[in-house]
């Protein structure tokens, strides 16, 4: 699961707690038993939504989708590994994929360390990747 992968990289000491919370959510139940550092991920207001989306597999959904799909990911994405984008692409009937060098989760091209990457999430002065914009326009014009 993507969130478990994220936690294993960013806060490995919380991985077992995360797995236990997901086990509870998969059973359709809500829990208030989680460490404070996981509050932003698992607060009580978010859990019903999480229970709902966990019932869906994006690979199965995109496999049934007949309309063209453009899958965009960056090789510097801290949240979604490019292998996830490739799994979607391989599952889709009619798709294109774009993996952008140095691009992160907020579609900004960042060179540097993880801290610089994370800081970019809150920097409105950074521009969306030109390559992403060009590819999106090209993709839409073909529809």
Predicted ranges, named:
Residues 76-80, 105-106:
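Acidic catalytic loop of the alpha/beta-hydrolase fold
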Residues 67, 80-94:
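Short alpha-helix in the alpha/beta-hydrolase fold that links the catalytic acid
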Residues 60-63, 86, 90, 134, ...:
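Solvent-exposed, polar/charged alpha-helical surfaces in well-ordered, non-transmembrane soluble domains
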Residues 13, 54, 80, 127-132:
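Soluble or luminal CAZymes and related metallo-dependent hydrolases
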Residues 20-26, 96-110:
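Short, solvent-exposed beta-strand-terminating loops
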Residues 65, 71-73, 77:
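Short beta-strand/loop motif that positions the catalytic acidic residue
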């Amino acid at each position: 699961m993507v969130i478990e992968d994220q936690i294993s990289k960013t806060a490995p000491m919380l991985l077992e707690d995360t797995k236990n919370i997901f086990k509870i959510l998969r059973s359709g139940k809500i829990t208030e038993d989680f460490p404070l550092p996981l509050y932003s991920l698992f607060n009580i207001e978010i859990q019903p939504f999480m229970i709902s989306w966990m019932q869906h597999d994006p690979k199965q959904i995109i496999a049934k989708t007949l309309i063209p799909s453009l899958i965009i990911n960056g090789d510097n994405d801290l949240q979604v590994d490019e292998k996830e984008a490739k799994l979607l692409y391989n599952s889709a009937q009619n798709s294109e994929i774009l993996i952008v060098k140095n691009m992160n989760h907020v579609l900004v091209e960042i060179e540097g360390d993880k801290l610089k990457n994370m800081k970019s999430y809150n920097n409105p002065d950074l521009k969306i990747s030109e390559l992403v914009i060009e590819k999106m326009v090209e993709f839409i014009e073909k529809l």
